[in-house]
Amino acid sequence: MSRDRFRSRGGGGGGFHRRGGGGGRGGLHDFRSPPPGMGLNQNRGPMGPGPGQSGPKPPIPPPPPHQQQQQPPPQQPPPQQPPPHQPPPHPQPHQQQQPPPPPQDSSKPVVAQGPGPAPGVGSAPPASSSAPPATPPTSGAPPGSGPGPTPTPPPAVTSAPPGAPPPTPPSSGVPTTPPQAGGPPPPPAAVPGPGPGPKQGPGPGGPKGGKMPGGPKPGGGPGLSTPGGHPKPPHRGGGEPRGGRQHHPPYHQQHHQGPPPGGPGGRSEEKISDSEGFKANLSLLRRPGEKTYTQRCRLFVGNLPADITEDEFKRLFAKYGEPGEVFINKGKGFGFIKLESRALAEIAKAELDDTPMRGRQLRVRFATHAAALSVRNLSPYVSNELLEEAFSQFGPIERAVVIVDDRGRSTGKGIVEFASKPAARKAFERCSEGVFLLTTTPRPVIVEPLEQLDDEDGLPEKLAQKNPMYQKERETPPRFAQHGTFEYEYSQRWKSLDEMEKQQREQVEKNMKDAKDKLESEMEDAYHEHQANLLRQDLMRRQEELRRMEELHNQEMQKRKEMQLRQEEERRRREEEMMIRQREMEEQMRRQREESYSRMGYMDPRERDMRMGGGGAMNMGDPYGSGGQKFPPLGGGGGIGYEANPGVPPATMSGSMMGSDMRTERFGQGGAGPVGGQGPRGMGPGTPAGYGRGREEYEGPNKKPRF
């Protein structure tokens, strides 16, 4: 009432933004009120100021709703209102059916409105009573009988029923007659199915027809439609009590309603748009990276009728997305269903719990996770990702989380939820039998089945067992025990027992903490000692390896030395063999020479004489001749000199001797005759080529002792 009284100007059965009433009753007239000829159920066209609107008039009390349409509008606006906004002077017919689009919530369906936008439930009121909205409120009438038609200002904010006639074209002459108060009231917007009149189609920005029941009342004028489809009751002169409010439907009822009134094409389009918008809203309920159709999205539905079918059970949850796994036990009256995300499951649980179905109240709860494990003794450095990675070797994981305190520090506990029971059983058995480590520290994790408790719904009164013990215990209401009474004494004993349990738990926790600290210190010392032993063993291993490598190196060097010695010995032996062979060859050559010399040295005198020349004439003048030797002359005859041979000319003899003395070669240049060859006797030009060969016998070693 406090904020809405600024919105209602004038009486009548109009909605929030009805300004101005009938002329006779004298309601507060707005400066943009329609002229006297305008009707209630007609859309507003271009209009101009009426001929009688000249000056302000005093406020008049609002008229009754049945006389609102018969009274002419007041001719003066309130004195506190500002001067009116002047519209363009020329008529523009296309502005009649093109009002601006109303503000709509993306999560709400469209509502039944007239050509003007209707504010939502949470829309802000006008700034003050002296400054009304800039949109001129009208009752939806054709252009009045002013001097000239004017274009329509921004559209009116009152609602029009779906069955209203279409807007009339602008005219500058005769005004149309308004409908009488005694005539039939406008049809309500809640009537399903196609309306009798043409569909109240919106303009380029106008909303569609209403979808929700509860349109404007027949006797109270058109009411303001809320986003849920319910009209706002008028505050003054309406057919509903002042300040009356209606209950808004829940979230899912706002999205799923019956077909809207109007043609079948409009209904199908609206149904498609609603389904698309609803699917988009469902997709927004899923968190980024959240897995779909998990065990956390599984709902338990109890107290089901015995004759329920699977299709009916699915239709019950169809508005919350496509259901996944469905199971129904008709004999015991319960079932399970798996939805897409946890948020959808929470919405379905909140809306369908305690819903009556064939005389039974449905009980909807989250199903217990049959494949969840509790993990304890976690290191402070284990995160959700590491926990999931570590346990993913046993099977697919739906969720793995490390429980933290209010400051975000790890409590050493975690929860791992598998997708199937065999994987959870395998992880439990493997971790119980073996030692499963997650970090470097030898701190094994302890795996146990998760104890699942319901801390959301608890135990409501309707689910408590009404047995005789329950009746006996509930006879006395809650109270504080009086001092000195029986219940006070035993209550104190109960409290002392609880205190003793608390102390013992604290002592056990303290002992366990000390034992853990001691084990950690021992483990740290043992770890350091173990590391030292490992280093020692590694050093010994390296030393042994080094010694072995040295031995191998020594052996290799010894082998190389032996090979070098063998090679040297072989080389020495080859050299000795070569030297021996050379000596043998030299000895053999020497023997051959000696043999040749010995054969020449032991020649008989006749053969030597034949080789050296006859008559002994060769020894004359020769240093190797008989004149220089101490042995007797070899040649025959007494005198072998030049004097003994007077027949030899001196020049020839001297030339022959000179030629033989000047030779540098051991043998002659001519053909060497045989050793025993016999040349011509005598000296002179007829001396053979091998003449000087006989001189070699004087150079041999066997001839040296003769000197």
UniProtKB/Swiss-Prot annotation:
sequence repeat segments run: 9-11, 19-21, 25-27
List every position bearing Phosphotyrosine.
Y293, Y691
Modified residue annotations for Phosphoserine: S8, S33, S273, S283, S374, S379, S496, S626
Q: Where is this cross-link: Glycyl lysine isopeptide (Lys-Gly) (interchain with G-Cter in SUMO2)?
A: K271, K279, K338
Taking the record's annotation, the residue ranges forming a coiled coil are 497-596
Keywords in alphabetical order: Acetylation, Activator, Biological rhythms, Chromosomal rearrangement, Coiled coil, Cytoplasm, DNA damage, DNA recombination, DNA repair, DNA-binding, Immunity, Innate immunity, Isopeptide bond, Methylation, mRNA processing, mRNA splicing, Nucleus, Phosphoprotein, Repeat, Repressor, RNA-binding, Transcription, Transcription regulation, Ubl conjugation
The record's section on Pfam families has: NOPS, RRM_1
Annotated Gene Ontology cellular components are: chromatin; cytosol; dendrite; nuclear matrix; nuclear speck; nucleoplasm; nucleus; paraspeckles
Dimethylated arginine: residues bearing it: R571, R693
Q: Which residues carry this modification: N6-acetyllysine?
A: K208, K319, K338, K421, K472
Name the residue ranges with Basic residues bias: 244-255
Q: Where is this region: Disordered?
A: 1-273, 579-707
**Omega-N-methylarginine: which positions carry it?**
R9, R236, R242, R245, R681, R693, R695
Q: Which SUPFAM superfamilies match?
A: RNA-binding domain, RBD
Tell me the PROSITE patterns matching this sequence. Answer: RRM
Q: Which residues carry this modification: Phosphothreonine?
A: T368, T687
Q: What is its main location?
A: nucleus
The GO terms this record gives for MF are:
chromatin binding; DNA binding; histone deacetylase binding; protein homodimerization activity; RNA binding; transcription cis-regulatory region binding
**Which residues are listed under the site Breakpoint for translocation to form SFPQ-TFE3?**
M662, R663
Where does the record place the region 3 X 3 AA repeats of R-G-G? Answer: 9-27
Written domain comment of the UniProt record: The coiled coil domain mediates interaction with NONO, and can also mediate formation of long, linear homooligomers (in vitro). The coiled coil domain is required for optimal DNA binding, and optimal transcription activation.
Question: What is the protein's known function?
Answer: DNA- and RNA binding protein, involved in several nuclear processes. Essential pre-mRNA splicing factor required early in spliceosome formation and for splicing catalytic step II, probably as a heteromer with NONO. Binds to pre-mRNA in spliceosome C complex, and specifically binds to intronic polypyrimidine tracts. Involved in regulation of signal-induced alternative splicing.
Clinical disorder: A chromosomal aberration involving SFPQ may be a cause of papillary renal cell carcinoma (PRCC). Translocation t(X;1)(p11.2;p34) with TFE3.
Record-given protein name: Splicing factor, proline- and glutamine-rich
Query: Which species?
Result: Homo sapiens
The gene name on file is SFPQ
